[in-house]
Amino acid sequence: MKKFVIALLLIPYLGIAQTLENLDYISPFNDGVAAIKKGNEWGFIDQEGKLIVDFRNDLVVTKTDNANYPIFEDDRCLIAHHKDGVLYYGYINKEGETVIAPQFLNATNFNNKKAIALKVHKETIGYNDIFKKDVVSYHYFEVVIDKTGTTIDHLTQLALHVSPQNIKNSGSPTITSKFISANLVAVKGNNSKWQIKKID
């Protein structure tokens, strides 16, 4: 009987949401969630204060007017992973699951269910008999992707050549195109002039 009474007294306390303490930063809510920082890791809470994405170190921060923190847009948040010394970008959902594997040299946050990314293409251009290896060329295009990571449209038709060694030394290439409305993208050409492209 004593155990039963103790159990009844504990029930109200078990229903209380977890308390998150010793946080270094709490962002404003965006897309129904807020980023929280503890040490060098970020996580996300929902509007009830429940931790929905556990603390992790691969979330990409976005520069805002007031601070830098990871954000969700259209149920997607940028992540970055190193592969062979090169940083590749992908996306997670609000359950913390990787929904677009890190594969892009750079990427933007989603906006109206679309994002701009630098997609890498690897082309075998020959074979080196001395080293017994394929000779490969890497180039990338600016592309618009949907929420599954599928390419909707190529923004740059001319491939920009890059070697993984150069990326290791200089960091992620810059995305020059930008959304100016839900279906219009401003694309910067090689002559530093802009063109407007409609994305369906």
Which positions does each model-derived feature cover?
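Bacterial Sec-dependent N-terminal signal peptides
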Residues: 1-20
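Residue-level detector of conserved, function-critical positions
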Residues: 18-200
